[in-house]
Regions:
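Catalytic domains of carbohydrate-active enzymes, especially glycoside hydrolases
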Residues: 1-32, 51-59
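Distinct, well-ordered alpha-helical segments
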Residues: 20, 41-48, 109-119
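Noncatalytic carbohydrate-binding groove/subsite architecture in carbohydrate-active enzymes
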Residues: 35, 75-201
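Carbohydrate-binding surface patches
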Residues: 265-297, 308
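Tight coil/turn sites that cap or link beta-strands
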Residues: 298-309, 333-338
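C-terminal beta-strand-rich structural cap/linker in extracellular carbohydrate-active enzymes
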Residues: 317-344
Length: 344
């Protein structure tokens, strides 16, 4: 699928043999290199350079992260002996002077906060998943409330550089707190699992809107949500759209607009888009209760919606968030309902 994305988030484990995949890259690449901290830093950079030569790409951003930091270490506990992160960043800038060198962790904010970057860097990185402590629906939908604190904290040590958050998915990509991701053969709501049964659900879309609204900050410049295919994908293996695809198409449509987060009202998270002198609101009810809200603007509006009544047939009815109907200023939200509102 030819999605108009700005970059490809591409993670490679350099502790394993590297290989060629010349058909992979048609966009700027954000390469995340998981490396062996016991290896000579110059040899690490040579390995990365060799990989890029095997896989011709426009390398736009690079994060070099010791693979051992996929594990979580307690602040007062024993930490591994690893070269300073600044040594990796300095070497990366020397080998790749035209590339933006990112700092941070591949895993969650907890690990980033415990191992803050040092030295010079061009951006900062962490990911976000909701099923660390509580995989219940309530636990998942409560996690966006933590993001304002997280973003404010990151701002204190980001050196005022751009922030990349991602991947942002219900299921986990790595388990910093155990030997491996939890097996979830029965596809239940399970902490630390890679596959989450709600990935293709309306809850997943509503949660994604809530998360996106809360990571908006002056330095939030890059966001990676899902994969194209696979467990965290937005397409099936035969290229059919999965539900999250409709939301990501919408977010990509607004990528060049001015984006603001709206004040949370009850359980309704939202975003305001200003584009070509037009105003749009993307709002999501993150609760199991029906909610009612009124927009401040005393203007005529049009709306589209996605709730349980039309979600089950999302692929059958040529659904689009841009199929608007006239509406007023009072809006009723079903559980997990998402609305796109256009102010006329």
């Amino acid at each position: 699928k030819n999605f108009d994305v700005d970059f490809i988030y591409h993670i490679i484990d350099f502790e394993k043999p590297i290989h060629s995949n010349k058909n992979l890259f048609n966009k700027p690449v954000y390469l995340v290199a998981l490396i062996d901290h016991r290896k000579n830093i110059n040899k690490i950079m040579s390995d990365i350079k060799e990989y890029i030569e095997l896989n011709p790409m426009y390398l736009d951003k690079l994060l070099v992260c010791p693979k051992i930091y996929l594990n979580s270490f307690q602040p007062a506990g024993e930490w591994p002996t690893v070269p300073s992160l600044s040594a990796y960043y300095k070497a990366a800038k020397s080998y790749f002077p035209q590339v933006r060198i990112f700092s941070g962790m591949v895993t969650n904010f907890t690990e980033l906060n415990r191992k803050r970057p040092d030295g010079d860097f061009d951006g900062i990185n962490f990911s976000f998943t909701p099923i660390v402590h509580d995989a219940s629906d309530y636990g998942v939908l409560d996690t966006p409330n933590s993001l304002e604190y997280i973003m404010n904290t990151v701002e204190t040590f980001s050196n005022d550089t751009p922030v990349h958050i991602g991947p942002i998915t219900l299921g986990m990509h790595f388990n910093p707190y155990g030997e491996k991701l939890a097996d979830n053969l029965n596809k239940i709501r399970l902490e630390m699992a890679e596959n989450d049964p709600r990935h293709d659900s309306l809850l997943s879309l509503s949660w994604s809107v809530a998360v996106f609204s809360q990571i908006i900050s002056k330095n939030t410049e890059y966001v990676t949500f899902a994969s194209m295919k696979g467990v965290h994908g937005i397409f099936t293996d035969d290229n059919q759209k999965r539900p999250l695809c409709y939301l990501y198409e919408l977010l990509l449509y607004f990528k060049n607009s001015k984006i603001f987060k709206t004040k949370k009202i009850k359980s309704i998270f939202g975003l305001k888009f200003l584009m070509n002198e037009e105003i749009f609101y993307l709002l999501a009810n993150s609760s199991t209760n029906q909610q009612v809200m009124t927009l401040d603007e005393k203007l005529l509006t049009r709306q589209s919606h996605l709730n349980e009544s039309n979600f089950s047939k999302i692929n059958d009815n040529n659904f689009s968030f841009f199929n608007f109907e006239d509406s007023g200023n009072d809006f009723s939200f079903e559980p997990y309902e998402i609305k796109l509102i256009k102010v006329k």
